[in-house]
């Protein structure tokens, strides 16, 4: 019974970590990374389709992404979607593929992105703390309903806190690594 509360909290915290990793993947660090285009959706035959499902995305050079559509007729739609996206990179269409040259980041841009990383990391920690609160509330509810004893409640609260501390430490590590990656020249 008590383990179910902890397992549910762990699972939700893992989802927070995965979400944070996806968010960090979308923050460009001055080098090509296919995950920059994960959030780009293309209007393809009237349906919003993720870019990676209608084109292959390769990295021929350190700062170049190459988008090769599976269907050449979708090239203009892909270019339109890339222009409309918030990635901040202008696509170059050469008729059969689209090149995205990632510009070198200025010092100011690096600092701004580092601030963004901190903000995203802090939001992830808030989400983890909310998960902890939900788990603690569930444990207290079970103690009130006499499903667990007061001693079991104290042990459970300590276990939940340990899981939370581990999750927050993991988020701090992820944030520090992303900041380091951004601030490297």
From Swiss-Prot:
Coiled coil: none annotated. GO terms for molecular function: ribosomal large subunit binding. InterPro entries: Ribosome_recyc_fac, Ribosome_recyc_fac_dom, RRF_sf. Pfam families: RRF. GO terms for cellular component: cytoplasm. Gene3D superfamilies: 3.30.1360.40, Ribosome-recycling factor. The keyword Cytoplasm applies. One of its GO terms (biological process) is translational termination. Its main location: cytoplasm. It is found in: Cytoplasm. Keywords: Cytoplasm, Protein biosynthesis. It comes from the Bacteria. Belongs to the RRF family. Responsible for the release of ribosomes from messenger RNA at the termination of protein biosynthesis. May increase the efficiency of translation by recycling ribosomes from one round of translation to another. This is Ribosome-recycling factor.
